[in-house]
Amino acid sequence: KFELPPANDNMRRVFAYLLNRRGIDKDVLYAFVHKKMIYESAQYHNVVFLGFDKDGIPHHANKRGTSSSSTYKGNAVGSVPEYSFHWNGKSDRLYLFEAPIDMLSFISLYHKSLAFSAESGKGGYTAGNLPDCTKFGRCTWRDHSYAAACSVSDKVLFQCLHDNSNIRNVSICFDSDEPGQLAA
């Protein structure tokens, strides 16, 4: 049975770890925290990355140690891999990663080039490669979809495709090691 790790009463260690040690952009991090997708566990002060179904019910919790001496990574007992940590956007783009940190790092590094303005024609796209959200005039990183498999599984990918019929373009952003390349 899936149970969420109890939350700590503050997120000091999580903010220090993600902002200072991992270099996650504060606006990107705050967007996920605001949606209650990231929190700090009470017992071990791990960062917890939550995955929800389309009705907003949590079904997956990936945990990552935050202390400088910790290499702990794992999923909470009963986590359903189809609903691992992900962000649903409205564009036709999905970026799939192995780990939540990889996903947040990518968004932090590229959030400006993931934006597109139909008026200026600027952004990380070429003429024949425009995202669906440009019909609304402007895209930001929030308009795209992102998922972290919390492994090299394809289960969250197929769940995202099932839940988001607008997705037409998938970028697999797995590590360049043997497991990542075999899965890709």
Predicted features and spans:
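Acidic beta-strand-to-loop metal/phosphate-binding motif
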Residues: 96, 168-177
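Acidic, metal-coordinating catalytic cores used for nucleic-acid/nucleotide bond scission
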Residues: 150-154, 174-183
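Short, aromatic/basic amphipathic alpha-helical patches
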Residues: 160-161, 182-184
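TOPRIM metal-binding catalytic domain and adjacent DNA-binding surface shared by DnaG-type primases
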Residues: 1-47
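Replication-associated primase and helicase/ATPase modules
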Residues: 1-9, 13-19, 121-124, 131-138, ...
